Amino acid sequence: MNFKEKLKLYIITDRRLKPEIASVKQALEGGATSIQLRIKNAPTREMYEIGKEIRKLTNEYGALFFVDDRIDVALAVNADGVQLGPDDMPIEIAREIAPNLIIGASVYSLEEALEAEMKGADYLGAGSVFPTQTKKDVKVIGIEGLREIVNAVKIPVVAIGGINLENVREVLLTGVDGIAVVSAVMGTEDVKRATEGLRRIIEEVLG
């Protein structure tokens, strides 16, 4: 599966900013190529029900669907993949449980990036590129830290953390395969329009 093209514009849900299903539909209308369902500490049943609806929408728009952390939910709703952080299920165990899922690894340093690649991650979510309101205590790697990771690994890299319309071009020029955003889309009044704005710049730079 050549999923790299679908990592260009990767939108992550945040219910503190917007309800999931309506905002995902608007992001897809605006050109999102991947959606990640991220809800911390939600009941499993609720995640399953929301995930089922997002799966329908992503199928309709030809986008990839990822679930943050929860392999069980990803499998239950027939998601394309799962995103795993350093405190989540180890990549190699996730691969045994779900051999057909695309596994993304969240990495915060060059060392973590190389380790995740070695353990079999399909792509990396690398950051935080800039300070971010979504995760205030996260380490900032900056543009240079991101470029180091891009140059060191062979698997696709998606940049995350504080990315917006003002800085997205600079991020894309590091050679990343895509960008992941939360606030730049979910924190705006018009989700569709915000997504369209990012998509235009991505198409200009990445083609």
Curated annotation (Swiss-Prot):
List, in alphabetical order, the GO biological process terms annotated in this UniProt record. thiamine biosynthetic process; thiamine diphosphate biosynthetic process
Q: What class of enzyme is it?
A: transferase
From the UniProt record, list the reaction(s) this protein catalyses.
2-[(2R,5Z)-2-carboxy-4-methylthiazol-5(2H)-ylidene]ethyl phosphate + 4-amino-2-methyl-5-(diphosphooxymethyl)pyrimidine + 2 H(+) = thiamine phosphate + CO2 + diphosphate; 2-(2-carboxy-4-methylthiazol-5-yl)ethyl phosphate + 4-amino-2-methyl-5-(diphosphooxymethyl)pyrimidine + 2 H(+) = thiamine phosphate + CO2 + diphosphate; 4-methyl-5-(2-phosphooxyethyl)-thiazole + 4-amino-2-methyl-5-(diphosphooxymethyl)pyrimidine + H(+) = thiamine phosphate + diphosphate
Residues the entry annotates as binding Mg(2+) = D69, D88
- Gene Ontology cellular component list: cytoplasm
Metal-binding is among the record's keywords: yes
Q: Cofactor comment in the record?
A: Binds 1 Mg(2+) ion per subunit.
What name has this protein been given in UniProt?
Thiamine-phosphate synthase
Record gene name: thiE
